[in-house]
Amino acid sequence: MVLIKVLANLLILQLSYAQKSSELIIGGDECNINEHRFLVALYTSRTLFCGGTLINQEWVLTAAHCNMEDIQIKLGMHSKKVPNEDEQKRVPKEKFFCLSSKNYTLWDKDIMLIRLDSPVKNSAHIAPLSLPSSPPSVGSVCRTMGWGRISSTKETYPDVPHCVNINLLEYEMCRAPYPEFELPATSRTLCAGILEGGKDTCVGDSGGPLICNGQFQGIASWGDDPCAQPHKPAAYTKVFDHLDWIENIIAGNTDASCPP
């Protein structure tokens, strides 16, 4: 059964699909402390519920279904228990969605741009990740990461982010297992995973990056639950297809429209 991988109050989608806002990495290893300077953690109260990506000193890109009230954003974090000296905290100044109705049930509009309340400073553990200069290719080896669940069946969450390498697959590989959802034949969504299973994002990883050949190509969006099942890869919002919208919003054109 597929369900939204966020918190219960995000089930406004009225779908039983696994949106990975609460997902973690399955089948990976602890990330090196120096390999995720762009990775941010989204908190509400004391709960880490999503990831995101710092794309410049003032903007974070994440999934639309990660939107919640009272979001706090931690940058430069590795261990949840032992803070880095250069960690910084911010809150959203503005949030922008590809659809004004925030109706990300269209599957390929699960993207949110957050303007921080003040710019961050680069440091040993904080630096932005550039937007992609070209689209990704099927067959690419991609890396994804997050503080999400590390067990597909148990509520086991790590202290530090986990990283895993997965493959970029044809979109149909994500569409075919779920005929009941009548997903569109084409989509601005990337499909990534390991067909034999065992490696995947999971609950708590939503909003985090998918990096293919060194470029930021995807935002963790939805997948099956339990995670990492054979022939059930996960879906990621395609960053490249939203470049014009992202760049227009950052430039101050808040009326910018999403790609059709």
Swiss-Prot record:
Transmembrane segments: none annotated. GO terms for cellular component: extracellular region; secretory granule. Its EC number is 3.4.21.-. It is found in: Secreted. Keywords: Disulfide bond, Glycoprotein, Hemostasis impairing toxin, Hydrolase, Protease, Secreted, Serine protease, Signal, Toxin, Zymogen. Belongs to the peptidase S1 family. Snake venom subfamily. This is Snake venom serine protease pallabin-2. The lineage of its organism: Eukaryota, Metazoa, Chordata, Craniata, Vertebrata.
